[in-house]
Regions:
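Long, low-complexity, charged/polar intrinsically disordered regions in eukaryotic proteins
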Residues: 1-8
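N-terminal helix-turn-helix DNA-binding core of bacterial DNA-binding proteins
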Residues: 11-52
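Basic, amphipathic "hinge/linker" alpha-helix immediately C-terminal to the N-terminal HTH DNA-binding motif
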Residues: 21, 73-95
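Short, hydrophobic-biased segments on the C-terminal half of alpha helices
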Residues: 57-58
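Glycine-centered, phosphate/nucleic-acid-interacting loop/turn motifs that mediate DNA/RNA or nucleotide
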Residues: 64-65
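Short beta-strand "wing" residues that participate in macromolecule-binding interfaces
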Residues: 68
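Short polar/acidic secondary-structure junctions
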Residues: 71-74, 121
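C-terminal regulatory/oligomerization modules of transcriptional regulators
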Residues: 96, 100-160
């Protein structure tokens, strides 16, 4: 079966975009990775309405990407912080790849907006695609892709 014969109904890229592919969702995740946790802080930093933020946070919690942790400041009602789950933390390479691409192709003329470095040695970090074998970073021309075991054939279009 060739790629164009494969249905995209169960495509993992499509499924991921369905969960996190919207602009505000990605910006919430960006901030969550930088340890923004509270509703008011997300709203103030990202600049979106309460309704949109509530909706996106609810969807991220329902998808198991964020979890809520109650907190209470003195004299205030109990509220929730939003923290990344293991599933949410697995999105780190995606957010870093978007940041890296943006710094290369859509950069602010003044330089980096977010300088991300390895805590231990201070070197800048970057995202690469590597082989599980003894090879380093790979270019798209150095890999092959073929339909996997979950690939389904595209259904024939209905006759006209």
């Amino acid at each position: 079966m060739e790629w164009l014969d494969v249905s995209t109904e169960n495509c993992p890229v499509q499924s991921t975009l369905d969960l996190v592919g919207e602009k505000w969702t990605l910006l919430i995740l960006r901030d969550a990775f930088i340890r923004v946790r509270r509703f008011d802080d997300f709203r103030r930093h990202i600049g979106l309405s309460d309704a949109v933020l509530s909706d996106r946070l609810r969807k991220l919690v329902a998808a198991g990407i964020l979890t809520t942790v109650p907190y209470q400041e003195a004299g205030s009602r109990t509220r929730n912080e939003y923290r990344l789950t293991g599933k949410g933390r697995d999105l780190w390479p995606i957010l870093m790849a978007l940041r890296q691409w943006g710094e290369t192709h859509a950069a602010d003329p003044g330089g980096q907006v977010l300088d991300v470095r390895h805590t231990e040695c201070g070197a800048p970090v970057r995202v690469v695609v590597e082989c599980d074998g003894p090879h380093g970073a790979l270019a798209p021309t150095e890999v092959t892709a073929a339909p996997g075991p979950a690939a389904r054939r595209v259904r024939s279009p209905l006759p006209e």
